[in-house]
Amino acid sequence: MNLTDKTVLITGGASGIGYAAVQAFLGQQANVVVADIDEAQGEAMVRKENNDRLHFVQTDITDEAACQHAVESAVHTFGGLDVLINNAGIEIVAPIHEMELSDWNKVLQVNLTGMFLMSKHALKHMLAAGKGNIINTCSVGGLVAWPDIPAYNASKGGVLQLTKSMAVDYAKHQIRVNCVCPGIIDTPLNEKSFLENNEGTLEEIKKEKAKVNPLLRLGKPEEIANVMLFLASDLSSYMTGSAITADGGYTAQ
């Protein structure tokens, strides 16, 4: 896949899809920098992986200075930045008439503004290099509306359009920008949400959730990481502004 010695910066890389991406890119001999708000989890990940190609920087992506520092840390540690994966995201379950403004703002700040801030500072280095690759984690919620998470859906719709806008604006600089739209993935974040917002055991809830798509199962984090590998590699060299759906057939129904 020609990813050896490429430097990849992944936000939200300490767990779930992000951590699967970390492992996938390390497996391709890439250098990986993880920017995550959870310092304890990030440091535990570094100890577990025990790989000189992995670096962690504690980052709140709603803070522009922190985003700039994360990008500069990647450049300083490994000598450049080839791929940015904007993966960090949150979800708050609440219908519009019950949602607090602070919760609405929090979801948009993390899921959309954080992506803008990370991209802004990564693009400066990519423009100087004359090439680059940005991969955004969107969601099926950016294509169709999941019930009871309007702020999340709105933020992911914004991610889809931000992806296309950046793709159009930076194609002439040989910077590709694409996104992946996962369906329901078996992650710690989703497990927490399942238990907080549904009746029954975790196993029972997962079985019910799996029924919504034709493959009749939840997705695995590594299955989304594999899409990211493809988008980061030369195998997708003619793709920019694209949204790859990996949802077990949910949106095909």
Curated annotation (Swiss-Prot):
Induction comment from the UniProt entry of this chain: The compound guanosine 5'-diphosphate 3'-diphosphate (ppGpp) is essential for the transcription of the bacABCDE operon and GTP regulates the transcription of both this operon and ywfH via the CodY-mediated regulation system.
Domain of life: Bacteria
Residues where substrate binds: S139
InterPro entries hit by this protein: NAD(P)-bd_dom_sf, Sc_DH/Rdtase_CS, SDR_fam
Enzyme Commission number, as recorded: 1.1.1.385
Catalytic reaction list: L-dihydroanticapsin + NAD(+) = L-anticapsin + NADH + H(+)
Annotated residues for binding of NAD(+): 9-31
Keyword annotations of the record: Antibiotic biosynthesis, NAD, Oxidoreductase
Knockout-associated phenotype: Cells lacking this gene show an accumulation of dihydroanticapsin and dihydrobacilysin.
GO MF terms, alphabetically ordered: oxidoreductase activity
Pathway: Antibiotic biosynthesis; bacilysin biosynthesis
Active-site residues from the entry: Y152 (proton acceptor)
GO annotation (BP), single: antibiotic biosynthetic process
Gene3D superfamilies: NAD(P)-binding Rossmann-like Domain
UniProt family annotation: Belongs to the short-chain dehydrogenases/reductases (SDR) family.
Function: Part of the bacABCDEFG operon responsible for the biosynthesis of bacilysin, an irreversible inactivator of the glutaminase domain of glucosamine synthetase. Catalyzes the dehydrogenation of the C7-hydroxyl group in the 4S-tetrahydrotyrosine (4S-H4Tyr) to yield anticapsin (epoxycyclohexanonyl-Ala). It is not able to oxidize the 4R-H4Tyr diastereomer and the dihydrobacilysin dipeptide (L-Ala-4S-H4Tyr dipeptide).
Protein name, UniProt field: Dihydroanticapsin 7-dehydrogenase
Organism: Bacillus subtilis (strain 168)
Lineage, uppermost ranks: Bacteria, Bacillati, Bacillota, Bacilli, Bacillales
